[in-house]
Amino acid sequence: GDNILKVDSFLTHQVDFSLMREIGKVFAEKFASAGITKVVTIEASGIAPAVFTAEALNVPMIFAKKAKNITMNEGILTAQVYSFTKQVTSTVSIAGKFLSPEDKVLIIDDFLANGQAAKGLIQIIEQAGATVEAIGIVIEKSFQDGRDLLEKAGYPVLSLAR
């Protein structure tokens, strides 16, 4: 279809680590003054840019896990995320022990389309009482409304390609 971008050679399947390291440095520089304490993403393709961003900021990186149905353990924070690409709703989760009210979080993800993944991560982070400082996106599908949704909700969005 017209809405598909092929990025499997460097981002979503094979990872170009030197490119990811540069991406991490760019996000780290942009958000250097924000006092970021954690980088949060969603599995799987957000992990590479997020880990290099966290490395450049020298903070931990947490990735939300996707599961169709999750056995609710104590202290697990969850949100529902609808994927327009796969047309399926997933439960995403992060163990609450990894986020605290003192945390200032930078969300990093590979794509921004409709903003549903970021919205789910924001819900989880806010359940923990932590603050979302900004959202960094490798590739924004600017013909979709994700940025609008997130900025209207008060979250700064930086995308490296749109």
From Swiss-Prot:
Gene3D superfamilies the record matches: 3.40.50.2020
Subcellular location: Cytoplasm
Binding positions for xanthine per the UniProt entry: 5, 12, 141
Pfam families: Pribosyltran
Protein's name according to its UniProt entry: Xanthine phosphoribosyltransferase
Effect of residue 131 to K: In strain: 12261
Role: Converts the preformed base xanthine, a product of nucleic acid breakdown, to xanthosine 5'-monophosphate (XMP), so it can be reused for RNA or DNA synthesis.
GO terms, molecular function: xanthine phosphoribosyltransferase activity
Entry's Gene Ontology BP terms: purine ribonucleoside salvage; xanthine metabolic process; XMP salvage
Residue sites binding 5-phospho-alpha-D-ribose 1-diphosphate per the record: 113-117
The keyword Transferase is assigned to this record: yes
